[in-house]
Amino acid sequence: MDIVVKIGFWKRAVAIFIDFILLKSAVNISLFPLKRNLDFGQLRLFDALTGVNSQQAKELTFYLILYCLVGLILSLIYFTYFHGSTGQTPGKSFLRMKVIQVSGDPINYKIAFIRWLGYFVSEIAMCLGFFWVAFDKNKQGWHDKIAGTYVVKKGRTL
């Protein structure tokens, strides 16, 4: 039985930053053709909100809603697939960490999905659920507690 090295807040924050860059890039690339065809011109947010050009405001609103929906869907796929298949996202892999069940077993797609849903609970109170990792004795965020997971140094098991 190896010693488990649970990963704390800052390393996890760097991993999620890497994942965020990858996800944001995927969303931007997937919506680039649409963005190119919309006529934002030199649109400023103030103009959109005040109705100076209502067509541009409608296009901007449509684009922002679509951007959020695509981001949500890609986030679901990204985190559920990577965590469910290998226990690690590219960000976690880069920093040599992975997600496991509290029993030490690898997580599956169901647990990965529950963990992803737990992200929303962690975000509800101004992201307190994520910062919880820094103060919890087991270094678990709320999403980890909901899914019954730990983030550990890769290669280490319970």
Question: Model regions: which residues?
Answer:
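Short, small/hydrophobic-residue-rich motifs at membrane-helix boundaries and re-entrant hairpins
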Residues: 1-123, 153-158
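Hydrophobic, aromatic-rich membrane-embedded alpha-helical segments
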Residues: 117-135
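Hydrophobic alpha-helical transmembrane segments and immediately flanking/interface helices
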Residues: 131-157
